[in-house]
Amino acid sequence: MAKRSTLAGLAAALLSSTAVLAADLAAPAPVPAPAEPCKATLIGPAFNGVIKANPNPTCFAAGPLGDIYVGGALTGYGYVQSNPFSNFATPAAPNERDRSARFDFSNLQGWIQKPEGMFQFFVQGGGYAIPGLGVANVGSIAQTDLLFTPLPVAFGKIQFTDQWSLQGGRMPTLIGSEAPFTFQNLNINRGLLFAQENVINQGVQLNWADGPWSVSVAGTDGFFAGDITWFTGSVAYKIDDSNTVGVNGGLNLGSQNVFARSARYQFATPVFQQNSGIFNINYTYSNGPWIVTPYFQFTNVEADPRAGIFNSASTYGGALLAAYSFTDNFSLAGRVEYEEQSGVRGSGTTSLLYGAGSNAFSFTITPTFTWDRYFLRVEYAHVELGGITRGSLADGTLGSGFGRDGNKTSQDRYMVETGITF
């Protein structure tokens, strides 16, 4: 009996010491779950409006490269307008005119991207139109050829850490509140203030993001000039899930005489804007059915005889963009803008708007129907000019406004666009 008691005591002591030892040992680390395939945050393109990015983009595994995503936009548009710029002509496309009516494709584009890992890339190519208010609009094939070529966006990116990255190539600008292509925006037409902003840049860009802050700086060629002389930057702060405030801008640190280049070069690179500086401040509210974005813009170009600019000029402008979604399939978007140029009407040769002392107001409304990846939208836009310089056909001079003689001060545009994004 005593022997059995001794053995039982030893067994109990052994079990107790084993339990204590087990308690002191760290629990084995759980095996990490493999990353879910094809669920990365995409690099682009940005969708800023009621036409939304595909929540399930096409994706395929590419071996050591990782997951590759592809998408695109196939859309067409048409419009009728009053008082076209009938006197518009460019040697770069001698058969192109600003017509009173046009039907064309607005996007025949596709993109491919690798948005994960240290080495990433984004490439977007195809045909496009970038219609804008208050400016001449030519055919989509001509725009694709003369603006940013059939390869408007193509850049590589190195993601050093979760916060830091460096990218280079052809990239969307850091400036402004509207994106280049129609499907990316609340409205079909780009606004008046958009005309002062460079759209696609070639250069190098450094990015930092941490918590609510995101900061980017870039050295670029500005208005697709080919020479890296522009410095641009953007700072955004996300106040909460619904509110974001930001500032962005840039300036040309050099001087370019665009007039000394070909007509083809001048089409994408306007001399006054290329040699200017610009500053924007914007705020965005996005919550439930509402999207609201007001922003203010200031631009300035100094006199520079080397660049063919003999008078300085500035513009001041503000815009309010908004959209309300009544249902998952129907929304209403709108935009109002006002912009003016400094100076006295008829003085100087520097025209950032419609000549010195001119001003412009625009109103746009865009009902939009969406179903899955398909959309259909119509648009009405009105532009009203003030302070234009008037001409006389009898004297062989043209005004700086709309119409055959440049003396018209208003333009109405009725537009429709439809297609799919995928």
Please provide the spans of the model-predicted regions.
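Outer-membrane beta-barrel channels and translocator barrels
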Residues: 65, 115-119, 161-163, 173, ...
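Residues that define the transmembrane beta-barrel architecture of outer-membrane proteins
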Residues: 66, 101-106, 147-152, 198-202, ...
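Glycine- and aromatic-enriched membrane insertion/assembly motifs of diderm outer-membrane
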Residues: 96-130, 325, 330
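Transmembrane beta-barrel strands of outer-membrane/channel proteins
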Residues: 42, 72-80, 123-127, 168-170, ...
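N-terminal periplasmic/intermembrane-space "pro-region" immediately following the signal or transit peptide
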Residues: 1-88, 417, 422
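Outer-membrane beta-barrel pore domains
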Residues: 94-97, 134, 141-145, 245-249, ...
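Residues on the lipid-exposed face of transmembrane beta-strands in outer-membrane beta-barrel proteins
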Residues: 72, 101, 105, 110-114, ...
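Surface-exposed coil loops of outer-membrane beta-barrel proteins
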Residues: 79-81, 85-100, 131-153, 161-240, ...
